[in-house]
Amino acid sequence: GMASKAGSVLGKVAKVALKAAL
């Protein structure tokens, strides 16, 4: 549902943020 979709998006954003931080 929406919650799982939001979690997936947050995970993607977190990964991109980690790459940017490195």
Swiss-Prot record:
The entry's keywords: Amidation, Amphibian defense peptide, Antimicrobial, Secreted
Tissue: Expressed by the skin glands.
Any one annotated GO CC term: extracellular region
Annotated coiled-coil segments of the chain: none
Secreted recorded as keyword: yes
Localization of this protein: Secreted
GO biological process per UniProt: defense response
Sequence positions bearing Leucine amide: L22
Protein's job: Antimicrobial peptide.
Similarity comment: family membership: Belongs to the gastrin/cholecystokinin family. Magainin subfamily.
UniProt protein name: Peptide PGLa-BM1
Source taxonomy: Eukaryota, Metazoa, Chordata, Craniata, Vertebrata
